[in-house]
């Protein structure tokens, strides 16, 4: 007998109209011939509790959470992964046997994309621009994957110091906060430089982080979390200095692939998902 009831996944956020994750996940469901759907749902902050109840009521396999729900969702979850507990934010929820499990795949997606490019984090010095949600997840996962030291460059002293302190206290990596000054020089011993801010994201494609680009060397690997455009001015300028560069597309695809497997138990068709994402931004 044909089954007309699809398994449901989706994303809760506000705004969510420009979120491309559904296209990526739906391409994977189709490629694996799974009767799953991904719903892009606007959820206002005051309605988050009801929305989380609906995950259980509708028997959803899981959901993604985007701004402004990644931290506020925590009280509605039954359990957190070790990384999500350290980060203090969740972007993925998995429902199993009526319980909601929180995971953070932001940093994991970044680390997977980095390793796929041939890089390793073991004993490396990492410098991160920003101290927001993406920076936090990436910093924790870099530390958990063997980074020796992490520099946090941020304009807000409070946020920057808090993240550096978190890394020092909860992981085996050392960490330091550096106040983001104009034309900020990148520490010369940096192996991996990451822009974890939204500077340069469409439509502000001519913007780039205010750093001294002459301090980027060919020995560095330079990464951006921004996926639209893929080749940001930040990455183009770093490449002109001889640095290896990694776009934000890989992080987004790997993050979506992790979500897919967490929800379905099936290995993700990463190539299909990457093609679907690239088509969205052609």
Predicted regions and their residues:
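Adenosine-phosphate binding glycine-rich loop
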Residues: 221, 225-282
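Glycine-rich adenosine-cofactor-binding loop
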Residues: 13, 104, 119, 123-144, ...
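Rossmann-like adenosine-cofactor binding region
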Residues: 172-245
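NAD(P)-binding Rossmann-fold cofactor-contacting core
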Residues: 145-170
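Short helix-loop-beta connector
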Residues: 96, 119-125, 216-218
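Conserved beta-strand positions in the Rossmann-like core of class I SAM-dependent methyltransferases
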Residues: 39, 150-151, 246
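Phosphate/diphosphate ligand-binding glycine-rich loop within oxidoreductases
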Residues: 2-117
């Amino acid at each position: 007998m044909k089954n007309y009831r699809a398994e449901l996944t989706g994303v809760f956020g506000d705004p969510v109209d420009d979120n491309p994750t559904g296209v990526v996940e739906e391409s994977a469901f189709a490629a694996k011939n799974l009767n799953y759907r991904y719903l892009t749902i606007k959820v206002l902050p005051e309605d988050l509790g009801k929305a989380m109840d609906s995950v259980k009521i509708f028997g959803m396999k899981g959901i993604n959470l985007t701004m402004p729900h990644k931290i506020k969702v925590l009280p509605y979850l039954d359990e957190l992964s070790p990384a999500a507990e350290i980060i203090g934010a969740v972007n993925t929820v998995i429902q199993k046997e009526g319980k909601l499990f929180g995971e953070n795949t932001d940093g994991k997606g970044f680390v997977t994309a980095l390793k796929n490019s041939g890089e390793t984090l073991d004993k490396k010095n990492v410098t991160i621009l920003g101290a927001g949600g993406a920076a936090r997840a990436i910093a924790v996962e870099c530390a958990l994957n063997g980074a020796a030291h992490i520099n946090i460059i941020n304009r807000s002293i409070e946020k920057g110091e808090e993240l550096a302190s978190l890394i020092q206290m909860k992981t085996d990596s050392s960490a330091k906060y550096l106040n983001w000054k104009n034309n900020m020089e990148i520490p010369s011993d940096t192996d991996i430089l990451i822009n974890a801010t939204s500077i340069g994201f469409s439509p502000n494609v001519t913007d780039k982080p205010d750093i001294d680009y002459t301090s980027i060397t060919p020995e560095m690997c330079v990464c951006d979390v921004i996926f639209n455009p893929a080749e940001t001015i930040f990455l183009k300028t770093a490449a002109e200095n001889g640095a290896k560069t990694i776009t934000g597309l890989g992080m987004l695809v790997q993050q979506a692939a992790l979500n897919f497997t967490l929800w379905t138990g099936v290995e993700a068709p990463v190539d299909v998902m990457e093609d679907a994402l690239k088509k969205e931004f052609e």
